[in-house]
């Protein structure tokens, strides 16, 4: 007897692959038993049935590593819970290094694993061979082994998750295609299928490569692309079942044991997109035609590593499309465009490894309104305007696929889809030697080459100090001793206006924004746990109007957070004005002298002190000047209507020549902010860190009886203390290269890892920031009393610790 579709549900999950089934399983575990999963055809029939099934855990993010580790823990127990086999085996994962640069990368990965509490053993070529005797090792420098990695049967795990979901009361319907969604006032109300209509509170779209076109029908952007992905399955030739999985990135290949044979695939540099104009009707349990010519480049690499493959029969060259994303990370979370519409898609061929944790996190997001921990690297709100364009997404995604196994260089930039968004100054800066990076489509000058000295404005990547090190040093010196201009046009800029603007922003912002017109406030915006969701500058430009500035990459995220947290009864409207203004940041001890030469406005310290915003005129152009800095010097952010930008820039450069005015880029900003101790959202601070833990308690209005979101959590921390605290670390080895994720040791015990790292040119030393953790509590005395070391690429380096800024701790230069 066919089960009848329910009329109502708390949540409807669309898609019956491993991600959808994991999400449904975890929704059931959280008590949402009136959850319904709808699959257009059969469970696993989209992509899951042809996935390779390798399960690795280590990523560059601690929380994504934790999420993948949860998958492993779930897969270990799932068979016992459901009675269904999963094919899970924890045979470990081996990663090879065939040159010194890759070996440095692997050693840094081992440090990262150690930081995150994941075991990773460094091996000699002989030790690697002992674990994987099918391979040649003549070119090996070393290898790494993660004993808790493994492999699984994707279809079996999915069926086990589906059974577990049913055991909790979740209903699953196959052959039930979703035809439409009913939406009222920007919120999901119902799901419509051929079998009936289901009223629901939440929709979770886990439809794999169908997700982008489906979501687009409702105004939701999910930037992913279907790409052909091939691997071979060999005949059995006596391969032991406990053989570890193997990744050989220098040869672009991966391997796992399969019924006494081998599965071998790889990531070619010239991938083939699929179904760019739409997925064909009836595409389920379907594979693409094998492309032997295209796979030949992977096969040649594999034969060089595993010569036995030359004499083994191949059962199948399997070609199945997988969904990939522009940055190689999957996509989770509630869509900023539509309330109650959640997404879990774009898993870049590591969906099996991710599924357990992704389903858990997505279920918590659905039921509690937020994920269990900060998932910014995979948050759907990390995308922006360029990601609406299918051609741009395709171009960037193919580049990301091709880099899957290439060296993961520090500071590496994408080259595809550029230039996309350009400041009005782009051509001028390019002609003056700018080497551009890209963020959210914006071209941003990272550093400037000295063209007169025949420097080339091009990054040369390495794990040592890169070719731009001295150039950034010149810019840093100019910031500290003269003046520079940073083109920061890419800043995201919003206006909040309306009769309740002050009341709304007072609720959202942790700092006091109820200040007079002309005031400028640095503030965080907190979640209910006190975690930092946004880190912004707020200028009050009129009685009922605020101008809000945030980082380039946070445009979608921060706009969504602010808009969602405006209390429903309040009259306040948020508008994105990013493209209306250019931003020239004039910074350095000579910045006021430069400004005085080009404006008739009084910019003296008395008339225009730190923390204020003024409208001034420059060459007939109206300029909103913000007296603020992110480099630790006297300075001004000049926000200029975009049509005036080149005029203002030219006037400033002409006036500043005799005062040492210099072009400078984002890498100089980074080195200066490290010296001054400014925090960076996404690394040093985020939803898992409170202002108290981050040393930003001074920016929270606890002395005023003003309610704001997160206040109760901050009160609890102030009363009970914290278990982690952000500190600054200065290695004794001036040549150490700090990149972030280096392990922090206090008195020989691992207590954390660096959240960010770089070099301070004024100090002449590397600088790192990271949280010192202790389950029994962390006080200032606890931090300052320890003897510290940093593990850098598996070498311990003694270092000093500080809780105060290393540069201008009294802020005398900023307030001059």
Show the residue positions of the predicted features:
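Glycine/proline-enriched, intrinsically flexible loops and inter-domain linkers
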Residues: 373, 380-816
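Beta1/beta-strand and adjacent pyrophosphate-binding region of the FAD-binding site
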Residues: 4-19, 36
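Central beta-strand plus flanking loop segment that forms part of the substrate or channel wall
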Residues: 52-57, 93-95, 209, 218-241, ...
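Flavin (FAD/FMN) cofactor-binding and adjacent substrate-gating region
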Residues: 74-77, 89, 98-174, 179-187, ...
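Dinucleotide-binding Rossmann-like beta1-alpha1 core, especially the glycine-rich loop
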Residues: 53-131, 250-255, 259-261, 282, ...
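Glycine-rich FAD pyrophosphate-binding loop
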Residues: 28-49
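Flavin-dependent oxidoreductases
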Residues: 22, 62, 180-289, 297-308, ...
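C-terminal catalytic lobe of FAD-dependent flavoproteins
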Residues: 154, 250, 259, 281, ...
């Amino acid at each position: 007897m066919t089960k009848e579709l329910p009329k109502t549900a708390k949540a409807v999950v669309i898609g019956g692959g491993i991600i959808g089934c994991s999400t449904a399983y975890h929704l059931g575990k959280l008590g949402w038993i009136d959850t319904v999963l709808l699959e257009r055809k059969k469970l696993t029939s989209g992509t899951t049935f042809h996935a390779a099934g390798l399960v690795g855990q280590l990523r560059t993010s601690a929380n994504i590593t934790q999420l993948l580790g949860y998958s492993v823990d779930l897969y270990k127990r799932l068979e016992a819970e459901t009675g269904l086999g999963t094919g899970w085996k924890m045979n470990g994962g081996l990663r090879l290094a065939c040159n010194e640069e890759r070996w440095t990368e692997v050693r840094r990965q081992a440090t990262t694993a150690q930081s995150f509490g994941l075991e990773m053993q460094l091996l000699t070529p002989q030790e690697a061979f002992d674990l994987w005797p099918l391979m040649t090792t003549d070119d090996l420098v070393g290898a790494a082994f993660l004993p808790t990695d493994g492999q699984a049967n994707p279809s079996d795990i999915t069926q086990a998750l589906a059974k577990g979901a049913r055991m909790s009361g979740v209903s699953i319907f196959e052959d039930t295609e979703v035809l439409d969604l009913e939406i009222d006032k920007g919120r999901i109300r119902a799901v419509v299928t051929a079998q009936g209509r289901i009223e629901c509170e939440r929709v979770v779209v886990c439809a794999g490569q169908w997700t982008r076109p489906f979501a687009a029908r409702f105004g939701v952007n999910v930037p992913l692309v279907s790409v052909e992905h091939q691997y071979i399955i060999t005949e059995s030739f006596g391969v032991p079942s406990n053989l570890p999985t193997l990744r050989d990135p220098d040869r672009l290949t991966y391997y796992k044991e399969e019924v006494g044979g081998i599965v071998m695939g790889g990531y070619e540099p010239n991938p083939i997109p699929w179904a760019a104009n739409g997925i064909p009707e009836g595409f389920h349990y379907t594979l693409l035609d094998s492309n032997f010519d295209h796979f030949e480049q992977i096969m040649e690499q594999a034969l060089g590593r595993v010569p036995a493959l030359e004499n083994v029969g191949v059962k199948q060259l399997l070609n199945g499309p997988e969904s990939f994303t522009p940055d190689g990370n999957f996509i989770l979370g509630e869509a900023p465009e539509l309330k109650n519409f959640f997404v879990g898609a774009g898993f870049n061929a590591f969906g099996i490894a991710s599924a357990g944790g992704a389903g858990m996190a997505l279920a918590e997001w659905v039921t509690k309104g937020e994920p269990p921990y900060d998932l910014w690297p995979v948050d759907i709100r990390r995308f922006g305007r360029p990601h609406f364009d299918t051609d741009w997404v395709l171009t960037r995604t193919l580049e990301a696929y091709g880099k899957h196994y290439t060296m993961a260089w520090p500071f590496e930039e994408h080259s595809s889809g550029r230039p996309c968004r350009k400041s009005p100054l782009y051509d001028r800066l390019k002609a003056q030697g700018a080497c551009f990076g890209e963020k959210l489509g914006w071209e941003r000058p990272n550093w400037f080459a000295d063209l007169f000295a025949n420097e080339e404005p091009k990054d040369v990547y390495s794990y040592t100090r890169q070719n731009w090190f001295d150039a950034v040093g010149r810019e840093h010196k100019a910031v500290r001793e003269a003046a520079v201009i940073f083109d920061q046009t890419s800043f995201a800029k919003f206006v909040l206006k309306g009769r309740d603007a002050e009341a709304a922003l007072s609720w959202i912002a942790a700092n006091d924004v109820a200040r007079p017109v002309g005031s400028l406030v640095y503030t965080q915006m907190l979640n209910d746990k006190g975690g930092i969701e946004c880190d912004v500058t707020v200028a009050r430009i009129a009685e009922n109007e605020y101008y809000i500035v945030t980082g380039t990459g946070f445009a979608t995220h921060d706009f969504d957070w602010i808009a969602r947290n405006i209390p429903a009864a309040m009259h306040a409207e948020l508008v994105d004005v990013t493209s209306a203004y250019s931003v020239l940041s004039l910074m350095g001890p000579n910045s006021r002298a430069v400004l005085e030469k080009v404006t008739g406005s009084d910019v003296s310290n008395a008339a225009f002190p730190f923390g204020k915003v003024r409208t001034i005129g420059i060459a007939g152009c109206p300029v909103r000047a913000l007296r603020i800095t992110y480099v630790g010097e006297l300075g001004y952010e000049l926000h200029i209507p975009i049509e005036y930008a080149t005029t203002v820039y030219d006037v400033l450069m002409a006036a500043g020549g005799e005062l040492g005015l210099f072009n400078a880029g984002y890498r100089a900003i980074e080195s200066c902010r490290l010296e001054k101790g400014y925090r960076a959202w996404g690394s040093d601070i985020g939803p898992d860190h409170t202002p108290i833990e981050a040393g930003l308690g001074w920016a929270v209005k606890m002395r005023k009886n003003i309610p704001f979101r997160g206040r109760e959590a901050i009160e609890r921390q102030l009363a009970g203390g914290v278990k982690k605290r952000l500190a600054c670390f200065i290695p004794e080895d001036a040549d150490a290269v700090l990149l972030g994720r280096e392990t922090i040791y206090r008195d020989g015990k691992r207590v954390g890892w660096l959240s960010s790292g770089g070099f301070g040119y004024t100090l002449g030393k590397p600088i790192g920031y990271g949280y010192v953790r202790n389950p029994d509590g962390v006080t200032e005395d606890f931090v300052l009393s320890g003897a510290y070391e940093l593990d850098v690429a598996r070498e311990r380096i003694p270092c000093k610790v500080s809780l105060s800024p290393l540069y201008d701790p009294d802020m005398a230069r900023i307030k001059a």
